[in-house]
């Protein structure tokens, strides 16, 4: 693991803030657009979440990686049109985004964070693909 004091880690964390802004903007667009959301917007959100996940793995930020991975899985289903971004599902993704921001802001202690509740909510998102949560 590279120290979070490391310059490279600082750059990663700064990029995470940018990625999370992209995620939030895109999720809000999804909430408003639902199934009519532009494919490029979904791809942009997916890529931003993927970048957060991959960097977290590099820096051994296990909880950030785990949460980003679970959110990315839901986004992948939306991206492949296997899941409709209903308002309830998007709200779960927004909650995950908010929690990720908190973990990124306190990255030094993020591996001790309790993320079970939001992981469970994300796991339930695709449970019924034909109707809202």
Where are each of the predicted segments found?
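Non-catalytic helical tethers at domain boundaries
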Residues: 1-133
